[in-house]
């Protein structure tokens, strides 16, 4: 697939699902001198700092094209988590202990063992130095990952599409922590693991990026968008899962409440008297 195919896919998924914001193209880069396309802005060049989740919001709501690096990013844990700076596991763990995200030192060490310690060195050795973020329909680069924010029913349609053939490649495998949800699970983990990830926006997303209470999300390897479009709305073969969502409506009568029932009796009496 070429760049135009991805841009068209961005338009198609936006239109078909009636999304409230644009799907996001995410591209990881190693060479800051040569891999940033014309028209892509670095916040630091205008004296700003910006987190990755904020860049996602600017891309999906305002169609901005941005490059975030360690120098641009005030959210230092995400710079470390993406391998942009060569901190040690010990140093990163100490920063998280000082943040008091976990109950105590032992809790944070258990978190490290479970979440990030085993792959810490591998991520740094990937040698990425930044990320290009843009609306998919106007992306200047072929994306490594695509992130879509949406409400619950629309997310269900995407999940149905990915699971339509139950192929191992497209299975969704997610864990949840409440931190680094959009930047990590929406972009970096799908790129590294080649697996789609459900995103429940976390602490930083809610605090920094203006994500609404009803919004959820999904991150996927870039090429998965074509599989989603191919299978969108196929699940159920018309049995209530088309768009907009078809929901069962209860069959009710006036016996639902005492007031309804009384009013029906009065109406019927008056109608009979008028005959």
Residue ranges and their predicted role:
Residues 4-275:
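Acidic, serine/proline-rich low-complexity intrinsically disordered regions
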């Amino acid at each position: 697939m070429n760049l135009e195919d991805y841009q068209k896919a961005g338009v198609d998924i936006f239109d078909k699902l009636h999304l409230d914001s644009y799907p996001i193209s995410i591209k990881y880069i190693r060479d800051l001198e040569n891999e940033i396309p014309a028209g892509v802005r670095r916040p630091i060049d205008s004296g700003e700092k910006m987190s990755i989740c904020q860049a996602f919001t600017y891309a999906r709501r305002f169609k901005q094209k941005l490059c975030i690096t360690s120098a641009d990013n005030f959210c230092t844990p995400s710079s470390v988590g993406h391998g942009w700076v060569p901190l040690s596991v010990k140093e990163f763990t100490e920063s998280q202990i000082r943040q008091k995200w976990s109950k105590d030192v032992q809790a944070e060490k258990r978190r490290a063992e479970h979440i990030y310690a085993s792959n810490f060195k591998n991520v740094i050795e990937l040698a990425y130095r930044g990320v290009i973020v843009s609306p998919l329909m106007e992306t200047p680069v072929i994306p490594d990952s695509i992130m879509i924010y949406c409400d619950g029913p629309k997310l269900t349609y995407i999940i149905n599409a990915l699971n339509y053939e139950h192929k191992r490649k497209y299975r969704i495998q997610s864990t949840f922590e409440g931190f680094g949800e959009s930047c990590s699970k929406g972009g970096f983990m799908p790129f590294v693991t080649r697996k789609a990830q459900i995103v429940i926006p976390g602490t930083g997303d809610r605090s920094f990026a203006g994500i609404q209470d009803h919004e959820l999300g999904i991150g996927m390897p870039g090429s998965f968008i074509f599989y989603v479009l191919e299978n969108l709305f196929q699940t159920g073969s018309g049995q209530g899962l088309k768009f907009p969502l078809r929901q069962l409506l209860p069959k009710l009568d006036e016996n639902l409440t005492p007031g309804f029932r009384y009013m029906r009796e009065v109406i019927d009496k008056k109608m009979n008297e008028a005959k």
